Swiss-Prot record:
Specifically methylates the pseudouridine at position 1915 (m3Psi1915) in 23S rRNA. Belongs to the RNA methyltransferase RlmH family. This is Ribosomal RNA large subunit methyltransferase H. It comes from Helicobacter pylori (strain J99 / ATCC 700824) (Campylobacter pylori J99). GO terms for cellular component: cytoplasm. Its main location: cytoplasm. It holds the Pfam family SPOUT_MTase. SUPFAM superfamilies: alpha/beta knot (SSF75217). It catalyses: pseudouridine(1915) in 23S rRNA + S-adenosyl-L-methionine = N(3)-methylpseudouridine(1915) in 23S rRNA + S-adenosyl-L-homocysteine + H(+).
Length: 150
């Protein structure tokens, strides 16, 4: 299995995320984080919400794959507990997660993905990545009946 977390951000590798990457390998899952922040995104965010959202879509579109489950993290999307999250990931070999910038996703991009919300609360990118990585590891623990999730 391969899970890739794409986000509009300048830098990532947090120590806690690295530990979840290592733990996911126990379940033969490569957990990768890719930060994207094209030059046009910085400029677009200064101009308007719509241009910012469009720049996020343009940055992410090359990574949308018909051979993968594509999941956009969106605060107004469906949410569920860790068991529901594990069901969503189960039986998929390649999963792409997308975390937009401050202005969120264009509706058009959301239609190309399954949208999922981590919480009703708003998180910084760093916290969202940590929560997402922990939930991926927890989902794998549930799928493989490892005692971590209890």
């Amino acid at each position: 299995m391969r899970c890739v977390v794409y986000s509009i951000a300048k830098n990532s590798p947090l120590e806690l995320v690295k530990s979840y990457q290592k733990q996911c390998k126990r379940f033969d899952c490569e957990l990768e984080l890719v930060d994207l922040f094209p030059k046009n995104t910085a400029n677009a965010q200064k101009v308007s919400k719509e241009l910012a959202q469009k720049s996020y879509s343009l940055a992410f579109e090359p990574y949308l794959s018909p051979k993968a489950k594509n999941i956009a993290l969106h605060p107004e999307a469906q949410r569920g507990d860790s068991f529901a999250f594990s069901k969503m990931l189960e039986n998929h070999l390649n999963i792409n997660f997308f975390i937009a910038g401050a202005y969120g996703f264009e509706e058009k991009f959301l239609k190309d993905c399954q949208a999922w919300s981590l919480s009703e609360m708003t998180f910084s990118h760093e916290v969202a990545k940590i929560v997402l990585c922990e939930q991926i590891y927890r989902a794998l623990s549930i799928i493989f009946k490892h005692p971590y999730h209890k």
